[in-house]
């Protein structure tokens, strides 16, 4: 469970760039953390992201097509990131690029999810 939350933090960094809070977000925090759980080893300083990690990143991006979805996912990720021990901010910021995903926002735990637009 702690690993899922840590992964979610990393995903949050990535998704907060893509997702934001909304009243009816289709993306649940469980989905966000579950999709990004395979990324935890990379997010905490491991070697490059695994294929399953990148598949989760792409799945999460596809699951958040609207501004509200992206903001909701972003907020879930920020919460999860706070629970990941030894989160490597550089690896979190590099995750989208390593997975060949383009996100027009900075990936960071300090990202303001409310500013994310679709």
From Swiss-Prot:
- Asked if the Swiss-Prot or TrEMBL record annotates the protein with the keyword Transport, the reply is yes
What's in the keyword line of the UniProt record? Disulfide bond, Lipid-binding, Signal, Transport
Entry annotated with the keyword Hydrolase: no
Q: Which Pfam families match?
A: Tryp_alpha_amyl
Could you tell me which cysteines form disulfide bridges?
29-76, 39-53, 54-99, 74-113
Point out the signal peptide segment: 1-25
Tell me which InterPro entries the record gives: Bifun_inhib/LTP/seed_sf (IPR036312), Bifunc_inhib/LTP/seed_store (IPR016140), Plant_nsLTP (IPR000528)
Query: Which GO terms of type biological process are on file?
Result: lipid transport
User: Which PROSITE patterns does the entry link to?
Assistant: PLANT_LTP
Superkingdom in the source lineage = Eukaryota
A GO MF annotation of the entry reads: lipid binding
SUPFAM superfamilies in the record, alphabetically? Bifunctional inhibitor/lipid-transfer protein/seed storage 2S albumin (SSF47699)
Per the similarity annotation, which family is this? Belongs to the plant LTP family.
Annotated function:
Plant non-specific lipid-transfer proteins transfer phospholipids as well as galactolipids across membranes. May play a role in wax or cutin deposition in the cell walls of expanding epidermal cells and certain secretory tissues.
Mind telling me what this protein is named? Non-specific lipid-transfer protein 3
């Amino acid at each position: 469970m702690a690993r899922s939350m840590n992964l979610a933090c990393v995903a949050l960094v990535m998704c907060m760039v893509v997702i934001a809070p909304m009243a009816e977000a289709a993306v649940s925090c469980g989905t966000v953390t579950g999709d990004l759980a395979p990324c935890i080893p990379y997010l905490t300083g491991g070697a490059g992201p695994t294929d399953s990690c990148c598949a989760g990143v792409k799945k999460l991006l596809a699951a958040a097509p609207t501004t509200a979805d992206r903001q909701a996912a972003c907020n879930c990720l920020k919460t999860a990131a706070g629970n990941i021990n030894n989160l490597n901010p550089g690896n979190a910021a590099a995750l989208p690029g390593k997975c060949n995903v383009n996100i027009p926002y900075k990936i960071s735990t300090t990202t303001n999810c409310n500013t994310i637009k679709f």
